[in-house]
Structure formats: structure tokens, C-alpha cells
Regions:
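Short, surface-exposed "cap/lid" segments of acyl-processing enzymes
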Residues: 46-52, 57-80
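Catalytic nucleophile-loop/oxyanion-hole region of alpha/beta-hydrolase
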Residues: 68-78, 89-127
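C-terminal catalytic histidine-bearing segment of alpha/beta-hydrolase fold enzymes
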Residues: 101, 225-269
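Primarily recognizes the serine-hydrolase "nucleophile elbow" in alpha/beta-hydrolase
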Residues: 113-172
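Short beta-strand/loop motif that positions the catalytic acidic residue
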Residues: 210-212, 216
Length: 269
């Protein structure tokens, strides 16, 4: 496969493709060094291919929105999907650093732009394209299910931070302050802002599957349960799948937890 580097100086209609031999297609779609994504395409004919192309899963990594965590976390999943005939679009985005004071808008903008870039790629069936996110990436996936102009075929949220206010009060993350560092403020006195970015306050406009390990100590499964209950109260049904593993087995391609997720993806194709 090859890397295709998109020049940020060109319009979307006039993309210049520079081919560089690498294991995956790395696409730099913006001017910032984090505005890129890796495209994994099946090497063999896909059993899921139609005239429009192959279905694709956009992957959003976790790490409590911190810059030090990268898309490498989702690379094994991307490789596994491609081996099974499903394209993967593994994205990077703006994460917060210790000196930052709120980057949530940049993060969401990057994710939305990456989703938009996917529609420009040849060989992709954009109608059957999905979004899958883990942990903080699960939060972003749920937000995309609510705000994305082009709705995903399916949204899978793996151990998602589905209620950022509850996550902040529970001091989730190593330092306990990751949510408010990403937001740039505390929830008290900024309720409307936090509601804008909180999945539990923004019902999805597409089908959602919640995948959560009952042994998860990093993001408790009650995050998914509370979200599902809140959506039901709003008249929105989401699917819940409780898994036996923890926060990391859910992204371990050698685990039974991952096999369950692959079966769900296949069921939608």
C-alpha cells in the first residue's frame, strides 16, 4: 500500500496525491501536524464490496483527549478490519496538553473534518461507513452520531465517556481532571457549554451500539447504562452489549470482546 499526502493548500476538488511507500495510506488533510488519518484498505477482494466500494469504519482513539495518546492505539483494530475485507479510517485529532486551556472545539472540528474527508476517497462505500470510538473516542463517536451532517451507517461506542459531567465528578482519568482540562472550565457555572458537548444531552440521529466491559475500572460500565437509560427516556433506543473484559480488552484484537464487536459490524453489512 502507499501513503497519499493531501496538500492543505489545495482545494478538495484538486487534491494532489504524492505517493510514498509505507504500510498504510497516511493522508494529511490539514495544515496542523495532527490533522491526518491512516487508511487501511483490504488487500484481497472483499466479500462486502459492492459497486459503490467497500464499507469503511472510522476509528477514534481514546486517551481522555490527551495529545500524548495517538491513533496507534487503534492500529491493530484497523489492520484486523482490513484483513477481513472492511476498510478502516484511523484518525488523529487535536488533543490537550498541560499548557492548554480547553481544546474541545478543535477536537470536535478535527473529527468532523476527518469524517468529511472520508467521503472524498475512492473505493469507499460512504453510505455503509460507520464510526467506532474507544473511551474518549467513544464520547466523540456518540457526539458525531448526534451532530454529523452525513449520518454514519452505525455508531459503535466502546467503553464511552457518555456523560462528561458525571465523569468529571467521578474524577475519571489518572489526574482526575482530564474532562475539565479538555473543556477548559468546570461544569459548575458553565452548564450550557457542557451540555453542548455531552452525549447524554444530545440524542443520536443514527443507530448506536454501546460495547462496555463489566470489569472496566477506567470508565465504569455505568456510563453506558446511564446513557442508554437517558436515551430511552427521550424515546431513543440504543443497543447495549455487556462484555466480560476490562477497558483495554475491548480494543485487543486477540480477545473474545473484540470478536463480539466484529460480529456486530458484520451483521450491519
Amino acid at each position: 500500500m502507499f501513503v497519499r499526502q493531501f496538500s492543505s493548500r489545495e482545494t478538495e476538488a484538486e487534491l494532489h496525491l504524492e505517493l510514498v511507500k509505507l504500510p498504510v495510506d497516511r493522508m494529511q488533510w490539514g495544515a496542523e501536524d495532527w490533522q491526518f488519518a491512516d487508511l487501511y484498505m483490504p488487500d484481497e477482494p472483499s466479500p462486502y464490496e459492492k459497486d459503490e466500494g467497500v464499507p469503511c469504519v472510522m476509528l477514534i482513539h481514546g486517551g481522555f483527549w490527551r495529545k500524548k495518546f495517538t491513533l496507534d492505539l487503534m492500529a491493530p483494530i484497523a489492520e484486523d478490519l482490513a484483513e477481513q475485507g472492511i476498510a478502516a479510517w484511523n484518525i488523529e485529532f487535536k488533543g490537550w496538553e498541560p499548557e492548554d486551556e480547553g481544546v474541545w472545539m478543535d477536537t470536535l472540528s478535527d473529527v468532523m473534518r476527518a469524517w468529511g474527508q472520508l467521503a472524498l476517497l475512492p473505493g469507499i462505500d460512504i453510505v455503509r461507513s460507520m464510526i467506532l470510538g474507544h473511551s474518549a473516542g467513544g464520547h466523540l463517536a456518540l457526539m458525531m452520531s448526534s451532530v454529523a451532517e452525513r449520518k454514519p451507517w452505525l455508531t459503535i461506542a466502546q467503553a464511552p465517556i457518555a456523560d462528561i459531567v458525571a465523569a468529571d465528578h467521578a474524577k475519571l482519568s489518572d489526574g482526575g481532571d482530564a474532562v475539565r482540562r479538555w473543556m477548559g472550565c468546570e461544569p459548575e457555572g458553565n452548564e450550557e457549554l457542557w451540555r453542548r458537548v455531552n452525549p447524554i444531552d444530545n440524542p443520536p440521529r443514527t443507530s448506536v451500539v454501546l460495547m462496555h466491559g463489566k470489569a472496566d475500572e477506567d470508565v465504569p460500565w455505568t456510563q453506558s447504562e446511564s446513557y442508554a437509560r437517558a436515551m430511552k427516556a427521550k424515546g431513543v433506543e440504543v443497543q447495549k452489549v455487556w462484555l466480560p473484559g476490562d477497558h483495554y480488552s475491548i480494543i485487543d484484537v486477540a480477545s473474545d470482546d473484540w470478536l463480539t464487536q466484529v460480529e456486530t459490524i458484520r451483521d450491519w453489512l
